[in-house]
A protein has these predicted regions:
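Conserved PLP-enzyme active-site core in the AAT-like
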Residues: 20-256, 264
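Conserved C-terminal alpha-helix-loop-beta "cap" of PLP-dependent enzymes
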Residues: 240, 248, 259-340
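Solvent-exposed, flexible loop/coil residues
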Residues: 1, 105-106, 147-154, 225, ...
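Active-site phosphate/pyrophosphate- and oxyanion-stabilizing loops and adjacent acidic/basic residues
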Residues: 10, 252, 300
Length: 340
């Protein structure tokens, strides 16, 4: 364990209210390892339909090639997760505030469905550090792309997985065979039994992720990247406050523009979806703002005529940006998936 990475892990774990964390080479590495740490060929997970395009591609294609099925549930109704669950379901997965529709995920509702069954909820909290605390609402695992808000400057790629230490992995041992059956690569160790004895903490998930998946994939975070990200972490609270304030001003301005058909923001939704934003986000509703200008051509024209904003994809760094998700970050999705 590198000491610089160790400092970053402890600080992000503290930020999230978790017990332990493991840094990895990127946010996508964090996502992949979270799933591979619980699921193997023949297993499945249930994931939200509201996800980053790269994650959808990972789930639909790469994990499928490894024999892991990902079933997609519309989070508008949390019961959709239960409907897709069977004896081979190893995890539920969602994003706290998914881009571009910004419909806040029903964290407690889905976590409460999974916990009695022995199914942990994994939340990607990349878009809402500080203002959203998934572990406090029942999520078992939180992950981030450190490249975004926590790093904050667009200088370093990294990812992290935080173990909440709040999930009873022994409740249904058959549900999680990778944690509850002997691991031959470690002399037959059973993670759920061995880790608490060695560490005094309920963190078999993150320990196995570190000593098995990080070992086998070779995707650690570079110590220099960790050092740069630590610099960003020191100001993330102040930056998120300003991000949220700026976004609210942008929303107010866009709502006065006749050519803007719809303004997308967590609190601009109606009904239960808006209530979730109010319930799960405190101190602001994030920096992401979406708008509908009618057609793909209008969107391209808008982007091409920007003078101050950058046309880049890395949210949460020092630059203000604008992007058309359907032709960039979500370009590998088909029309039906884009509409979902």
């Amino acid at each position: 364990m590198n000491p610089t990475c160790d400092v970053l892990e402890k600080r992000v774990a503290a930020l999230e209210g978790g017990v332990a964390a493991c840094t990895v080479g990127s946010g996508q590495a964090a996502t992949a390892m979270c799933i591979q740490n619980l699921a193997q060929a023949g297993d499945n997970i249930v994931a939200s339909t509201d996800l980053y395009g790269g994650t959808v591609n990972l789930f639909k294609n790469t994990l499928r090639q490894q024999g892991i099925e990902v079933r997609f549930a519309d989070p508008a109704d949390p019961k959709n997760f239960e409907k897709l669950t069977d004896d081979k379901t190893r995890a539920y997965y969602g994003e706290s505030c998914p881009n571009p529709y910004l419909r806040v995920f029903p964290i407690k509702e889905v976590a409460d469905i999974g916990r009695p069954k022995g199914i942990p909820l994994i939340i990607d909290n990349t878009a809402s550090p500080v203002i959203c605390k998934p572990l406090a609402h029942g999520a078992a695992i939180v992950m981030h792309s450190l490249t975004k808000y926590i790093g904050g400057h667009g200088t370093s790629i990294g990812g992290i997985v935080v173990d909440g230490g709040n999930f009873d992995w022994t409740k249904n041992r058959k549900r999680q065979p990778l944690l509850n059956e002997p691991d031959q690569s470690y002399g037959g160790a059973v993670w759920i039994d061995a880790v608490p004895k060695l560490t005094g903490a309920n963190i078999p998930f993150v320990i196995r992720l570190r000593v098995v998946l990080l070992r086998d994939t070779g995707a650690p975070l570079a110590p220099f990247n960790a050092w740069q990200i630590i610099q960003g972490l020191e100001t993330v609270g102040l930056r998120m406050k300003q991000h949220c304030s700026n976004a609210e001003k942008v929303v107010t301005f866009l709502e006065t523009q006749k050519k803007v058909q719809n303004v997308i923001y967590p609190t601009n939704h109606q009904g239960e979806i808006k209530e979730r934003a109010l319930k799960y986000m405190k101190g602001g509703y994030g920096s992401l703002v979406g708008m509908d200008v009618g057609t793909k051509e209008n969107g391209a024209k808008f982007i091409d005529n920007l003078k101050m904003l950058y046309h880049v994809a890395n949210i949460g760094d020092a630059r203000s940006l604008a992007i058309h998700p359907a032709t960039t970050t979500h370009s590998q999705l088909n029309e039906k998936e884009l509409l979902a």
